[in-house]
Amino acid sequence: MTRPSARHVLPEFTERTSAGTRTSDPYSKLLQERIVFLGTPVDETSANDVTAQLMYLEHQAPDRDIELYVNSPGGSFTAMTAIYDTMRYVACDVATTCLGQAGPSAAVLLAAGTPGKRAALPGARVVLHQPALTEPVRGQAGDLAVHAAELVRVRARLEEILVRHTGRTPGQVAADLERDTVLDARQAREYGLVDRIVPGRRTPPASSGAR
């Protein structure tokens, strides 16, 4: 597994075990606690890392929850669908929590958590917008038509996923994707992207019925 990039040196912990000593980093410690952290843009590398961890944790204990923490600006729709499909494939419930931000692709993963187990910290920010091509398309008319058709397919798939997990109507989701829709934690809860706002581990969470 490739470590997420960091601007600082990650600390390492040395623990004494029955077999001797073991050195690990924060991400390894989180994995031991069944926590997967998505803290980078959603791309092929991060998708492979997250899906591998989800499948490993399912194999380790298929009857225990997995916690997916999200702080990501979003990214590739294709990479996002790899994580999304794996979340739905594994037998474990996947609880999702947004801390910081969940950009468009990451917002889908946040919403795709097990119903009742989707949360946001008070300062979280969630963004929705329609998919776009990552770079200009060049070529003959037939090539442009292929890319246009794929963009329409991706847009339809994104709308379908958001409708499924938020309870919004197709018309509402389609309208909200026409422009950048920026939501704070309370608005994300009202939209149906999360179920509750969690101020802290010792503080009772604010559920969807709270104002």
Swiss-Prot record:
It comes from the Bacteria. Disulfide bonds: none annotated. Pfam families: CLP_protease. InterPro entries: ClpP, ClpP/crotonase-like_dom_sf, ClpP/TepA. CDD domains: S14_ClpP_2. GO terms for biological process: protein quality control for misfolded or incompletely synthesized proteins. One of its GO terms (molecular function) is serine-type endopeptidase activity. Residues 1-24 are annotated as: Disordered. The active site is at 129. GO terms for cellular component: cytoplasm; endopeptidase Clp complex. Belongs to the peptidase S14 family. NCBIfam families: PRK12553.1. Has lost one of the conserved residue (Ser) proposed to be part of the active site. Therefore it could be inactive. This is Putative ATP-dependent Clp protease proteolytic subunit-like. It comes from Streptomyces coelicolor (strain ATCC BAA-471 / A3(2) / M145). The gene is clpP5.
